[in-house]
């Protein structure tokens, strides 16, 4: 018995095409009718009249036949259009029983393991509520649920659920970013879930939340000091893969909040320090037999220092910039000739705050924050065959710019500028994997971060050191060692 597959949408489009063809033919017949049905005789003789009458008769017969075909065409289009509705109604009627049957069969299959182990045999894990972990996937087949993003009541993101035998791990939830002006720290991201133990990718780690900016200072006796910016939340690690699969990427660290500004114009109070950037997290390990390691997460950018307040007396000192977050370590590779994950880049240091202006003495600018250290590249494992390449080390973060000194109106000069921050050091590259064939290449070292410049009068920051390249793996021949990272530029 042959089977017929019908897609109502395609059938409806075909009916519209057939209707447009009929309309075009009717228009052509109508345009030709006046000139073909009333052919004039070429002369006054009987032969010419007979020929004209013969052709005119043919035209009238054609028009009559065309009218019959037009009626048939209209009936065909109506039948085709009606069949679209019939098929659509049949699909709608059959869909609900089939879905119900599917749910009943799955419920019967999952009932024993759900009762004994609290986990289904087949099916995806549920996504977590805010700040809660995602559910585990089915023991045999199913992806882990994603962790819920953090909120005010549960600032840290939930972890992603683990998969069973086959399936991908759930992604970790992002950390909560509190409201500006509170100076609260950002929530940490959740860890990625593990991939299926036989086959499946690890879930990505959740990103850290952004730290809130600090509150500005206020007047009074004594004046209310400005509050520092909140630190960015740390990212969490990516999930490990199973036997086959790629490790999850590590979460990115959250940015630090800006420091609050000092009070103006009463006290000329100092600005507050910017928050530190959150650390990036490690990438997940690649599959134990074959799979790439996940990349490490980047460190968060630090917050800028608050500006110093202005006053009739001495202006306030600008706040120091925060330190950039460190990059995460790259995930290790599997033994089947895969690549290890690259280390995450260090976060940039925050800029120093501007010194407060004054009619007498300008305030000093804040010191720029130091850049974060790059993450180490992932290592490769011993392989059968050619060795695998290691991950590159992460670059160090750039140092923050030193704050500008405050302006002295009456003495026509400026306050001392802040020093630039130092660049972060680049990380070492991972070691290449050995093998029975050629050894894998070592990972390149990360470049050092550039030192922060000053804004006139202050000392510039020093560039960070480049990371050391990883050694090549042992093999026939041995792998090539990775190149060392470049020294960062001085500010």
Curated annotation (Swiss-Prot):
It comes from the Bacteria. Residues 207-238, 255-275, 444-491 are annotated as: Disordered. Residues 207-221, 229-238, 444-485 have a biased composition (Gly residues). Disruption phenotype: Deletion mutant is partially attenuated during murine tuberculosis, but not during the chronic steps of infection. On day 28 post infection, shows a slight reduction of the bacterial burden, but on day 70, bacterial counts of the mutant are similar to the wild-type strain. Residues 1-93 form the PE domain. InterPro entries: PE-PGRS_N, PGRS_rpt. Pfam families: PE (PF00934), PGRS (PF21526). Induction: Expression is down-regulated in macrophages and infected mice. SUPFAM superfamilies: PE/PPE dimer-like (SSF140459). One of its GO terms (cellular component) is cell surface. It is found in: Cell surface. Expression of this gene in M.smegmatis leads to low levels of NO and IL-12, increased level of IL-10 and better survival of recombinant strains in macrophages. Belongs to the mycobacterial PE family. PGRS subfamily. This is PE-PGRS family protein PE_PGRS26.
